[in-house]
Amino acid sequence: MAIVIVGAGTAGVNAAFWLRQYGYKGGIRLLSRESVTPYQRPPLSKAFLTSETAESAIPLKPESFYTNNNISISLNTQIVSIDVGRKVVAAKDGEEYAYEKLILATGASARRLTCEGSELSGVCYLRSMEDAKNLRRKLVESASVVVLGGGVIGLEVASAAVGIGRRVTVIEAAPRVMARVVTPAAANLVRARLEAEGVGFKLNAKLTSIKGRNGHVNQCVLESGEKIQADLIIVGIGAIPELELATEAALEVSNGVVVDDQMRTSDTSIYAIGDCALARNLFFGTMVRLETIHNAVTQAQIVASSICGTSTPAPTPPRFWSDLKGMTLQGLGALKDYDKLVVAINNETVELEVLAYKQERLIATETINLPKRQGALGGSIKLPD
């Protein structure tokens, strides 16, 4: 019997790493539906898109990590069911893998468009390395690029595309970009910087249809009636947690697989971590599903400590980062229910610091191009009493 980990992204690979760090001696099997060794996903929406030399993404761990730590990894292995009674997962090819403990690190998939024309050639999504390779090829062939969604991923892709001379328009349904992630001050500075680089923005704008020519996208039609030329449409409108396995196994699910503070699901032999998990976050003070590297690594460490019976790591504030056309954007803490913002901005140097307070307690920070300052602020964010 072994610990089986379904999903070999950041959460899954780090779970295997921490299990060995905490002294687990049994078998560990990583199951990945992809065809390549586990890799880092953040660069896919940044430098990888415009690189002329990178043939593959940066590995999460060197191949020697898996052999040296006696971690078995199976590629091209799509798990389709869990038999909780027999403690077995079954792959699409019929192969079965028995588990003592099962860790679901299945991640999330891109939210798909459903409007007229959404199936035309030239409508692209970005989640995997294959997606990134396909998108990189299409960027070379395209003059006019429309990015649907003004979140972090959408703006990273827009930044990369305008950097290689493409005409780029971002369509966002909200009144501002990154509305769910950062304060208006940070959003406005990012938007102004990208506009100066040539990125166009359509805010409060809703896509109603996509028109094509000879089976390929040609233009986007907005609710206002405006039509925008598009040789390539990149969709970044959020992600949906992969819940099929958990649902089929009758685990409790909501906007994610529901887990306790030890990452256990409603079946105590099964855990869930990373983008697919809905967990209580002490800094947010509620159940949340976070799609960040920090969250994936943190939950991987928690699940390993739980299985190995070691003390649970002390909670650390949520964090994220992004690179956007000469801007390093960093966020720390839970930007929620604040009652005071202290903003310092330098438009000439493109630097920003935002401190968010709740009842005089610092709960979150944002910085642009101030990495040392962000690092210094990290220890100032404490859990509520």
Swiss-Prot record:
Its main location: cytoplasm. Its cofactor is FAD. It comes from the Bacteria. Gene3D superfamilies: 3.30.390.30, FAD/NAD(P)-binding domain. It is found in: Cytoplasm. GO terms for molecular function: flavin adenine dinucleotide binding; oxidoreductase activity, acting on NAD(P)H; rubredoxin-NAD+ reductase activity; rubredoxin-NADP+ reductase activity. It holds the Pfam family Reductase_C. It catalyses: 2 reduced [rubredoxin] + NAD(+) + H(+) = 2 oxidized [rubredoxin] + NADH. Transmembrane segments: none annotated. One of its GO terms (cellular component) is cytoplasm. Signal peptide: none annotated. Keywords: Cytoplasm, FAD, Flavoprotein, NAD, Oxidoreductase. Pathway: Hydrocarbon metabolism; alkane degradation. Its EC number is 1.18.1.1. FAD binds at residues 8-11, 32-33, 79, 156, 275, 293. One of its GO terms (biological process) is alkane catabolic process. It is an enzyme of class 1 (oxidoreductase). Homodimer. Involved in the hydrocarbon hydroxylating system, which transfers electrons from NADH to rubredoxin reductase and then through rubredoxin to alkane 1 monooxygenase. Belongs to the FAD-dependent oxidoreductase family. This is Rubredoxin-NAD(+) reductase. It comes from Pseudomonas putida. The gene is alkT.
